[in-house]
Amino acid sequence: MRIPMTTKHIYIDWDGPYTLDELEELDDPRIDYGLYQVLMTFRVGGTLVLEDSFAFPAMMLQRIGTEKVTGFPGVPTVFAMLLQMDLSQHDLSSLRYLTNTAASLPPTHIQELRRKFPHVTIFSMYGLTETKRTLYLPPEWLDRKPGSVGVAIPGTEAWIEDDAGHRLESGQTGELVVRGRHVMRGYWEAPEATAARFRPGPIPGERLCYTGDLFRMDADGCFYFVGRKDDIIKSRGEKVAPKEVEHVLHALPGVREAAVVGVPDPILGEAVRAFVVTADPALTERQILAHCRAHLADYMMPRDVVLRRELPRTPSGKVDKKALRGGEAAPADE
């Protein structure tokens, strides 16, 4: 990828929460979220505590106390695991803030994080490699904007368009478009992919990024992630946003993680399939479907539920839905 040098300056100058003493780094520095933790630490003169992985969360939590870590950047998978742990055995009093990216946190997870970390400021953000961090929710808005990833960071303009290129008003769903000096210049030696993702802006030489992500915006200008355009499920002639079904699943006590995909169905066109990781081994597929039936329209109902010990991940920590779709038979874990 070709990324302008101004990108790092915009993100660093914004600072966000990074007035820090010590930052714990779980993210691969070869991925943008991890790389910017390194740059931020240099910018503010902090200390970076490196972790190999989240395979041993108790050791990581112990190191937070030992090193007096003040900032913890994570992704939804990591926070879902933290919410299932007894944190009272660890000294986390030094933590001042948590940041989340890769995918939006379910509102129920944010509520639980607030309960388990009452003294910590939580930043819910959205970004992609092509534009880096793009949206953030001011922490003081968490209670009144549940599920939102906020507004554009300074120096960024963001809006929503329909397939015809018209800007949409609040309450409507469309593709997020991003404008700013931090939008990357293109994919290395891939002109067709570059042309599909980027279009000319109003200033000569400027590029707009068409993210491929569906959002809606409320009357206050706050953005809500709906899903990837290519993740939308077309079932019974209706469009189903997986994120809406996933939020319902996450609201069921005992569900640690959930991912929803569409699978071919000869009658429905596509059927909704839910993959669920449970924290409660007694939770059954039947109970999960009953919960969905009570909270979802018929066309959004999962045809089946597959229980998993864990969900496949991309290198950036997102759920790998392509891998989930690939397992057509999708047998449950033993």
Could you tell me what each predicted segment is?
Residues 151-155, 166-199, 240:
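Conserved ATP/PPi-binding loop(s) of AMP-dependent carboxylate-activating enzymes
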Residues 3, 7-8, 12-26:
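Active-site neighborhood of HAD-like aspartate-dependent phosphohydrolases
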Residues 102, 127, 150, 213, ...:
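Active-site glycine-centered loops adjacent to acidic/histidine catalytic or metal-binding residues
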Residues 72, 180, 185-186, 196, ...:
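AMP-binding/adenylate-forming catalytic core of the ANL superfamily
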Residues 24, 30-70, 85:
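Conserved AMP-binding/adenylation subdomain of ANL enzymes
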Residues 43-46, 66-74, 83-145, 157, ...:
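Gly/Ser/Thr-rich phosphate-binding loop
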Residues 326-334:
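Acidic/polar alpha-helix N-cap and adjacent early helical turns
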Residues 94, 119, 155, 193, ...:
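Glycine-centered tight turns that cap/initiate beta-strands
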